Amino acid sequence: MKLSMTLSLFAATAMGQTMCSQYDSASSPPYSVNQNLWGEYQGTGSQCVYVDKLSSSGASWHTKWTWSGGEGTVKSYSNSGLTFDKKLVSDVSSIPTSVTWSQDDTNVQADVSYDLFTAANADHATSSGDYELMIWLARYGSVQPIGKQIATATVGGKSWEVWYGTSTQAGAEQKTYSFVAGSPINSWSGDIKDFFNYLTQNQGFPASSQHLITLQFGTEPFTGGPATFTVDNWTASVN
């Protein structure tokens, strides 16, 4: 749920790159692959990210992880991210995305999710926001989003649990809405703007004053493993 502060930036020709340090990152605009072990000190274990293909047309990568201890805490959010021009959510016409992924060990505590941040200030740090939108394509074990379930909604032709909760990030309150699939969705193409439209119409999300500042897709491991999470291909754009 937290975005890495990039400490290492590898060349765009990062195919085959292995990243094991806390905030390693590889980039080929507009895409990046990020290690992001932001919660590693809350448990014991290891994790590395392997870039399979990274270009201007998409990202393919996998991560191998094993974590124990710190039950109920996220250890990392290894992800692929998109660089885009920040704009008000109300001015975004569409956010098309497509992903195919797999998880070899499902006897773990983890989720597979999109993570987006918005903020009134377009220059807000991209590691948090006034609002966070998460789309859980899978959850394994007993993990739950922050807060509690407040509704069930059909968005993009699929049924989702809708959760809401708050947390303190960088000294300020962050409001998090999570849409959770009832069973794993290993291949998905959709428009994330549909989720913002739902929140605007049903939960009072202030789309006309919030800028979209971050868009990522990855996995949050809590405990378990060894496990391998593989992204065969991920694409996204903000229009």
From Swiss-Prot:
Q: What class of enzyme is it?
A: hydrolase
Keyword annotations from UniProtKB, A to Z: Carbohydrate metabolism, Cellulose degradation, Glycosidase, Hydrolase, Polysaccharide degradation, Signal
Tell me the leader sequence span.
Answer: 1-16
Q: Which gene encodes it?
A: cekA
Pfam families with a match to the protein in the record: Glyco_hydro_12 (PF01670)
Please report the name of this protein according to its UniProt entry.
Endoglucanase A
The Enzyme Commission number assigned here is 3.2.1.4
Organism ancestry = Eukaryota, Fungi, Dikarya, Ascomycota, Pezizomycotina
* Entry's family note: Belongs to the glycosyl hydrolase 12 (cellulase H) family.
Give GO terms for biological process.
Answer: cellulose catabolic process
Quickly give the catalysed reaction: Endohydrolysis of (1->4)-beta-D-glucosidic linkages in cellulose, lichenin and cereal beta-D-glucans
- Summary of the function given for this chain in its UniProt record: Has carboxylmethylcellulase activity.
- One example GO MF annotation: cellulase activity
